[in-house]
Amino acid sequence: MKFIIKLFPEITIKSQSVRLRFIKILTGNIRNVLKHYDETLAVVRHWDNIEVRAKDENQRLAIRDALTRIPGIHHILEVEDVPFTDMHDIFEKALAQYREQLEGKTFCVRVKRRGKHEFSSIEVERYVGGGLNQHIESARVKLTNPDVTVHLEVEDDRLLLIKGRYEGIGGFPIGTQEDVLSLISGGFDSGVSSYMLMRRGCRVHYCFFNLGGAVHEIGVRQVAHYLWNRFGSSHRVRFVAINFEPVVGEILEKVDDGQMGVVLKRMMVRAASKVAERYGVQALVTGEALGQVSSQTLTNLRLIDNVSDTLILRPLISYDKEHIINLARQIGTEDFARTMPEYCGVISKSPTVKAIKAKIEAEEENFDFSILDKVVEEANNVDIREIAQQTQQEVVEVETVSGFGPNDVILDIRSVDEQDDKPLKVEGVDVVSLPFYKLSTKFGDLDQSKTWLLWCERGVMSRLQALYLREQGFANVKVYRP
């Protein structure tokens, strides 16, 4: 079987040296992706296309599907390459190939020709089109918007019968641009922004700020691995996980409620910039869209950018949510994003939309930056190829209850401000306060003869924290959902 790879049009308008470099990189990317399907596969580059030849017919659909997801490819032609003698021979081969497909349909013939011949492309179109129209009674010629377009390519003494055309994702081949680090949360925005930079030719590494224990990290790892495996598996990339719970805890204790969102984003950018510098990455990528949330106003985005010299790319800055969700659906990350948790403990009640630099800096003076340095230093860096095995590990489920027994105590894990604003009172059971960001260090000090029912407003943080505690060996935890 044979496939003809057509280049993304922006590649074809580059200078000769740049075009050749892009084609060489794309050829290497195709080999890296397809070698898993057929090790004997041949990839041959030409000036205006790339040929892929494979012997294992059983892998035809898998190879075709993989090619449609490699950045830099405009479309793929699945072809049958046969010799021919003259124009009538071309017609006979076209009739054998397309007869069933054209029955009862309108059609036209389009021919591309390379080499020296006694006929022109238009003459072949007329001869083959007339012959098909004469020999297939139910078919008729229609030159504009036909049901079927018969594509033929003539090159020297070879005829390419095009059996199918399949659209690629376009863009530039990965590796033609420099590396970037995507701040991935597993939601709609970060997944789509990561894809957009891969499509533009960047090798995308991933940085995840863990606010909810191992379960959340497993979910985000699955998203990152999916994106890499589907669109970027030609290159090795890193997945860096930073335990940001200590940083969030420090912010919740030391920073004014209205400034928390901007300060948290500034801390994330500081941490990600350190990671990017460590690995020689040139830019950060975020999924921020202008005005989508309080921290994404122009004033706040500028303050967030000010904490680092690292370039921050925001490919979704002018997109609305509906457009982003549609893109997530197209690339296959919608289902991941819909089930990814949001954290009730990290949201300000009255976030500022126009933060003042002096006030933000004054709030940050109370912050212990050694905590930030420590979490970056202890960041977990893994090769994304290892994630497939790691994400298969089973996560222990935690029981959810709506009632309580005589040995049960409700543990309110919301932030202190949330608890002060809306105290939890449940008749017939004790309620103890312990903010979620202190659970990892303080839960062991509680009475372990009791069964602790974790509770938060949305029920997501409580479940994840209960799973985290179970992983630490605490079996006396459940989730309370009245």
Swiss-Prot record:
It is an enzyme of class 2 (transferase). The keyword Membrane does not apply. ATP binds at residues 183-184, 265, 287, 296. Residues 404-482 form the Rhodanese domain. GO terms for cellular component: cytosol. GO terms for biological process: thiamine biosynthetic process; thiamine diphosphate biosynthetic process; thiazole biosynthetic process; tRNA 4-thiouridine biosynthesis. Gene3D superfamilies: 3.30.2130.30, HUPs, Rhodanese-like domain. NCBIfam families: ThiI_C_thiazole, tRNA uracil 4-sulfurtransferase ThiI. This is tRNA sulfurtransferase. It comes from Salmonella paratyphi C (strain RKS4594).
